[in-house]
Amino acid sequence: MTTSTGTTTGTGTARAAEGSLLRSDWTEAEARALYDLPFPELMFRAQSVHRRHFDPTTVETATLLSIKTGGCAEDCGYCSQSAHHETGLKATKLMGVEEVLSQAQKAKDGGATRFCMGAAWRSPKDRDLDAVCAMISGVKAMGLEACVTLGMLTPDQVTRLGAAGLDYYNHNIDTSPAFYPEIVTTRTMDDRLDTLASVRAGGIRLCTGGIVGMGESVDDRIAMLLVLATLDPHPESVPINMWNEIEGTPVMGKADKPDPIAFVRLIALARLLMPQSIVRLSAGRDAMSDEMQALCFLAGANSIFTGDVLLTTANPERDKDAALFARLGIRAAAPAATEMRSAAE
């Protein structure tokens, strides 16, 4: 098929780019062909697909709180919270339920519609899960969506989280299968996928994405998205993180961050591969210009974290985000992700 710009694409790639179907059988060649499109064509296709499924003037706002910081047994090379690295981060115990709910109320007052809680564990202990479930129930009672990231889960733990009312479980795949052993050695990609399968089987929505700028190749970045886009069904939420440089981590000094245009291409590809997923412009926004973020929204990103801290790294202040939204004519989404669907969907 030849587009109006003279670009030739495969039939399956063109159909998906037109937003006519959801696919979980993407190939590497198809994804690469989309990524390599002339930038104006790529942006046009991504925005066109985005408009078929979402209100293009609406962006979800979420707040992320570290409820248990540091001391993690995993050796993720990008993470300040690993006990294997000397990053100067002091480990803390699990926060109390009331303290967490107080922070959730502040997040709601600041305009957040989803409250995400992260604990630096390889996997949670059952005794700690009691407190986390109480946090989830309290967050839900405020009218916020609840999301947690706790590490690997057993099916029984998934059931307990679901009973507490959990909306989303975050469990990032980090990077491509090929590059994964370069970043993490204490777990495998299959371990991550097994937990995602358990969460899906338990009826909880998936929030799973990855990190770029850790020294991986463009092919690795595309392969990471392909892992997500070949899940059936697709994850409901896909966070894309730009790695924040953290002294003391093994990745420090090896990072090779994509330039702004390359990063925007990745956002556009995520939108084309997973048309109905929320695509979150996640960590790393603090170093992005307003213009770069605007291009990401145009490419199909429709979620951000608000608040000046993401777990242990910086994030733009709420006032700065509000000013950017005002300049772009963007408004915050309603609490439920389904409210973001366009009237035509």
Curated annotation (Swiss-Prot):
Transmembrane segments: none annotated. Its EC number is 2.8.1.6. [4Fe-4S] cluster binds at C72, C76, C79. GO terms for biological process: biotin biosynthetic process. Pathway: Cofactor biosynthesis; biotin biosynthesis; biotin from 7,8-diaminononanoate: step 2/2. Signal peptide: none annotated. It catalyses: (4R,5S)-dethiobiotin + (sulfur carrier)-SH + 2 reduced [2Fe-2S]-[ferredoxin] + 2 S-adenosyl-L-methionine = (sulfur carrier)-H + biotin + 2 5'-deoxyadenosine + 2 L-methionine + 2 oxidized [2Fe-2S]-[ferredoxin]. InterPro entries: Aldolase_TIM, BATS_dom, Biotin_synth/BioAB, Biotin_synthase, Elp3/MiaA/NifB-like_rSAM, rSAM. Gene3D superfamilies: Aldolase class I. Coiled coil: none annotated. It is an enzyme of class 2 (transferase). GO terms for molecular function: 2 iron, 2 sulfur cluster binding; 4 iron, 4 sulfur cluster binding; biotin synthase activity; iron ion binding. Binds 1 [4Fe-4S] cluster. The cluster is coordinated with 3 cysteines and an exchangeable S-adenosyl-L-methionine. Binds 1 [2Fe-2S] cluster. The cluster is coordinated with 3 cysteines and 1 arginine. Keywords: 2Fe-2S, 4Fe-4S, Biotin biosynthesis, Iron, Iron-sulfur, Metal-binding, S-adenosyl-L-methionine, Transferase. Residues 57-285 form the Radical SAM core domain. Its cofactor is [4Fe-4S] cluster; [2Fe-2S] cluster. [2Fe-2S] cluster binds at C116, C147, C207, R280. NCBIfam families: bioB. Belongs to the radical SAM superfamily. Biotin synthase family. Homodimer. Catalyzes the conversion of dethiobiotin (DTB) to biotin by the insertion of a sulfur atom into dethiobiotin via a radical-based mechanism. This is Biotin synthase. It comes from Xanthobacter autotrophicus (strain ATCC BAA-1158 / Py2).
